[in-house]
């Protein structure tokens, strides 16, 4: 189309959804921003004009750098992320990087983006404690974990293992909440199970439980 481009670039999506939780103590997060045309893009922690935004993204500025979704990628690293609070960022872009400044179209409104700082995930209790008894060859035992804090008040996904080896963990039957349970049918003996829980911000917590079956 030979007619001049008078439309500012549009940010279509981001590699991390806005309002996502981030891990406690992370400080910075790498992000990809996807734009509908070649552009130069910037970000700031304040809503301000493109020309005075402090941070420049590393953007695809050539038509040949289009991705499979027909978008152009900008890479950046969002810094200054604080724990336990909302972290607001603002993005703006300017199109036609090879044209004179007066021919380029710039965003007059920012693309708002938010990351939610979190706190450490805690395992507050594990069960069973002590001894489990029954009057059959196998005794039903309920493993239980209770989690708190973290990205979303303890909501997390927990796994258990009898060895603690990296690939030995199995998702607990009831999880994705603050209480996590798993029924096992065990024979007489001494048992030690390890638990590993991870929340939606990537915070992790581990614990173990030791008990006997009589």
Stretches with model-predicted labels:
Residues 7-23, 123-136:
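Short, solvent-exposed loop/edge segments of extracellular or virion-exposed proteins
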Residues 68, 75-90, 182-192, 201:
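Surface-exposed, short loops/turns at beta-strand junctions within beta-sandwich domains
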Residues 34-40, 47, 145-157, 164-166:
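Short proline/glycine-enriched turn/loop motifs at strand-loop junctions of beta-rich domains
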Residues 97-108, 202-210:
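Beta-sandwich strand segments
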Residues 57-77, 172-182:
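Aromatic sugar-binding surface patches on proteins
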Residues 23-30, 134-144:
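Short coil/turn motif common to extracellular beta-sandwich-like domains
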Residues 1-14, 103-125, 214:
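Proline/serine/threonine-rich low-complexity linkers at boundaries of modular beta-sandwich domains
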